[in-house]
Each structure stands twice: as structure tokens, then as C-alpha cells.
Curated annotation (Swiss-Prot):
Protein's job: Involved in the degradation of certain denaturated proteins, including DnaA, during heat shock stress.
Entry's Gene Ontology molecular function annotations: DNA binding
Keyword field contains Secreted: no
The organism's taxonomic lineage, starting at the top: Bacteria, Pseudomonadati, Pseudomonadota, Gammaproteobacteria, Candidatus Palibaumannia
Any Gene Ontology CC annotation: cytoplasm
This protein's record includes keyword Cytoplasm: yes
Gene giving rise to this polypeptide: hspQ
Identification of the protein by name: Heat shock protein HspQ
């Protein structure tokens, strides 16, 4: 069983670029059809570690869906980000839905 370091609804930072993001899904290993760089195909430990669907914002504040390896992400220490309130709202909304899911008939 593969354990992931981060959970759905958690805010994270990209280690290299420092971008704030919110995890919206987790894959136990790389699951896209083709690796977007040759290193992923060659480095089995990177490919078989958890990968995350992360929503970030571009320079204009528009949401961007990214697919990142666990090694590319770090913990975010702060819960509030005045410069990116929509990501705070997204994270809170996801966490609330996970705590109290709506039942469908």
C-alpha cells in the first residue's frame, strides 16, 4: 500500500516555484497516459510515488489544474492567504464537503 503525504483539500506549496495550491485528487502513482518528461519514465521511484491533482492560480488569478509529483510539493504553514483568497475558499469548501458529504437519492 502506498501512503500519501498530503490529503484532498490540503493547501501545499510548489517546492521549486513557491506557488500556492490546493489538492483536489491523489493518484497512488503516475497515471497519465504518457509521461510529460523522459525523466519520469526513467525514474521508477518518482513514477511509482503518489501524484497529485493540484489547483493553482496563474498571474491573472485564473485557476490552473496541475499534475505534480509528491517530491515537488511541500507543506503550507498558513491557512489564510489574503493575496489568493479563492484558493483559501476552495480548500475550505473541499474540507467541509469531506466532513459532511451530501447524500444523493
Amino acid at each position: 500500500m502506498i501512503a500519501s503525504k498530503f490529503g484532498i483539500g490540503q493547501q501545499v506549496r510548489h517546492k521549486l516555484f513557491g506557488y500556492l495550491g490546493v489538492i483536489i485528487d491523489v493518484d497512488p502513482e503516475y497515471s497519465l497516459d504518457k509521461p510529460y518528461i523522459d525523466k519520469i519514465a526513467a525514474d521508477d521511484s518518482l513514477r511509482t510515488a503518489p501524484w497529485y491533482h493540484v489547483v493553482m492560480e496563474d498571474e491573472d488569478g485564473k485557476p490552473v489544474h496541475t499534475y505534480l509529483a509528491e517530491a515537488q510539493l511541500g507543506y503550507e504553514a498558513f491557512l489564510e492567504h489574503p493575496e489568493q483568497p479563492t484558493l483559501d475558499e476552495l480548500a475550505e469548501s473541499i474540507r467541509l464537503q469531506l466532513q459532511a458529504p451530501r447524500l444523493r437519492n
